[in-house]
A protein has these predicted regions:
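Solvent-exposed loop/turn segments connecting transmembrane beta-strands
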Residues: 1, 28, 111-121, 152-154, ...
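Repeated loop/turn-to-beta-strand initiation elements of outer-membrane beta-barrel proteins
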Residues: 1-5, 44-48, 92-96, 136-142, ...
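Transmembrane beta-barrel strands of outer-membrane/channel proteins
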Residues: 6-16, 50-56, 101-111, 144-150, ...
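Gram-negative/organellar outer-membrane beta-barrel architecture
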Residues: 1-83, 91, 164-175, 186-190, ...
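Residues on the lipid-exposed face of transmembrane beta-strands in outer-membrane beta-barrel proteins
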Residues: 8, 36-40, 52, 84-88, ...
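C-terminal hydrophobic structural anchor segments
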Residues: 198-232
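C-terminal outer-membrane beta-barrel translocator/porin domains of Gram-negative envelope proteins
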Residues: 83-87, 91-203
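Sequence/structural signature of outer-membrane beta-barrel proteins
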Residues: 11-17, 55-61, 89-93, 108-116, ...
């Protein structure tokens, strides 16, 4: 189904950023997003979008750790971004699926005047994710996944830098990648690759327990990604698939933050 769409989104965000488990910044900001796109659906499950996005970010407050030698100067920013996105999904359910896979990929060019960024060539980003479910019987399932994002170019805005953390992608920032064991946002280098494996057992009709582990690699040069910094994490979780959305709690650990924390999620996201 071909469709031409226009959308406007306003968000008021209160965001904490961490460095290896220690909070370094807190910022509140307003985000205005205006987007126009053309989309089509092929073969029932495959969808693509091509479009132009305008974003304006206005920072109101910045709190930072006094140990930070050079706190960032967060001035109002605007961007004109070109994007193409692809999404192919055969999952049988949005939450707690029992079969299928979900593949997403995209490429975005970031500019501040539709041609350049700060007087030089624009920077760009590539993201690819693959999540799948393999069930063994009616109760047990294995869920492998891969998430990656690569930034190309120089002078990359901090607002679009790679970040990881949380149980689901894009919870706090659109380009945020999930990572078991880290429940807040941790900035990463220009190339980021994450491999994950979750074991899930259904106890009763709507009750689940799970054990998830993942490995992340980050480096500023994608061609040397396997020589980059390795990050490990895991969590043990319980979930209830309620009529109001998933009610979940988990406890996790990561060597990157070297701490264990409890995480709670209530309802749809």
């Amino acid at each position: 189904m071909k469709r031409l769409a226009f959308s406007y989104t306003y968000q008021y965000n209160d965001l904490n950023l961490y460095e290896k488990g220690h909070r370094t910044y807190n910022t509140t900001y307003q985000q205005h997003t205006l987007e126009t796109s053309y989309s089509d659906v092929w073969l029932k499950d495959f969808r693509y979008d091509i479009g132009l996005q305008f974003e304006y970010i206005h920072h109101e407050d910045l709190l930072y750790n006094i140990d930070i030698p050079t706190p960032p100067h967060l001035k109002p920013q605007h961007f004109f971004n070109y994007f193409i996105r692809m999404h192919y999904s055969t999952l049988d359910k949005g939450y707690y699926p029992s079969k299928g896979f979900d593949f997403q990929a995209g490429y975005t060019i970031y500019t501040d005047n539709m041609a350049q960024y700060k007087g030089h060539s624009p920077f760009s980003g590539v993201h690819v994710s693959w999540h799948s479910v393999y069930s063994f019987g009616k109760r047990f399932a294995i869920l492998p996944s891969i998430d990656s994002r690569i930034l190309i170019g120089r002078g990359i805005s901090n607002f679009y830098g790679n970040v990881l953390g949380g149980d689901v992608s894009a919870r706090y920032l659109l380009h945020q990648l999930p990572f078991a064991g880290i429940h807040h946002i941790e900035p990463m280098k220009k190339s980021l690759l994450i491999g994950s494996l979750k074991l899930r057992q259904r106890l009763a009709n709507k009750h689940y327990i799970s054990l998830a582990g993942n490995i992340g690699i980050t480096d500023n040069r994608f061609q040397h990604i396997l020589k980059g910094e390795y990050i490990y994490g895991f969590n043990l979780g319980y979930g209830f698939n309620s009529d109001f959305g998933p009610l979940e709690t988990s406890i996790g650990y990561s060597d990157y933050t070297d701490d264990m924390k409890l995480y709670v999620n209530l309802g749809f996201f």
